[in-house]
Amino acid sequence: NLEEKITLKILRNTNIVVSLGGGGFINEKIRNQVLTNHFSFWLNWNSEILLSRIKSSKKRPLAQNSTNQEIMKLIKKRSKIYSKAEFKINCNKLTKTEIVKKVIKIYELN
């Protein structure tokens, strides 16, 4: 898989920030590499917020032909895997700036 190969190559670097998007952390090889060698953050929003964002995005190929129920099922399934991240940030009531500040603070403390 080309995405896996490229991502694993990128993850060999240090002092980088990588946003893995929807499916990256789902991949077991990628997830293991991240959890072993890097800080990992789960930026968690409630399911309704995620559903709204996914449905309104034109860049979400899985959502184009999916029902709300199917998307919610996928969110629930993926959340179980995302929750394996080292750090979790509840983003429901945070601005982008507040989220960035939290990530930086956690990084600096570790």
Question: Each predicted region: which residue ranges?
Answer:
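ATP-dependent small-molecule kinase phosphotransfer cores
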Residues: 1-35, 60, 68, 79
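Alpha-helical elements of Rossmann-like donor-binding domains used by nucleotide-donor carbohydrate transfer enzymes
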Residues: 5-6, 49, 98, 102
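NTP-dependent small-molecule kinase module
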Residues: 13, 39, 76-110
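Catalytic metal- and UDP-sugar-binding loop of GT-A-like glycosyltransferases, i.e.
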Residues: 20, 43, 91
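Short glycine-rich anion-binding loops that position phosphate/pyrophosphate groups of nucleotides
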Residues: 22-25, 46-48, 94
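Short amphipathic alpha-helical segments
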Residues: 29-32, 52-56, 101-102
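A glycine- and Lys/Arg-enriched "phosphate-lid" helix/loop adjacent to the NTP-binding pocket
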Residues: 37-80
